[in-house]
Amino acid sequence: MDRGMKSKLYIDKNLQQFDDFKSTLTGDFCNFCADNLPIDNDFEVYVVADREPHGISTTAAYHVGNNKCVIYGKNRALVDILRSIAHEMTHMMQDEMGLIRGHIQDAGGFHEDQANARAGELIKRFAKSMKERKAIYENKNNFRS
């Protein structure tokens, strides 16, 4: 579903596990999340190799009011990176809907519970939507033709 929004995915060149196939899958997943949450405005997703310069203390962060997610990608399986993207994009949806006021607690509570639940749902729905998308669960690209 194209609502005229622009999405940008940036993958750190130091993340050597991202070949063209995984980069394409990641871009497809970001658009899948945007369509299914939904996200109504332009957004950016950064997958980075270093936490500190990007303000990440755990595995990911959402920048409230900027529609920007930053995901730590070093030494993580693709499915875990995608789950983090879906989690932070759920916060993006909450932000667009005006549901975020102030700080979001790190564990528990409405915002985190919804983000965790939606992330799991989006991963499963994406993997089931096309055969080659099941490759998100693999270390190698076993589903390419």
Model-derived features: where do they sit?
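Active-site oxyanion-binding pockets that recognize sulfate/phosphate
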Residues: 15-19, 75, 105
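Long, well-structured alpha-helical subdomains associated
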Residues: 124-145
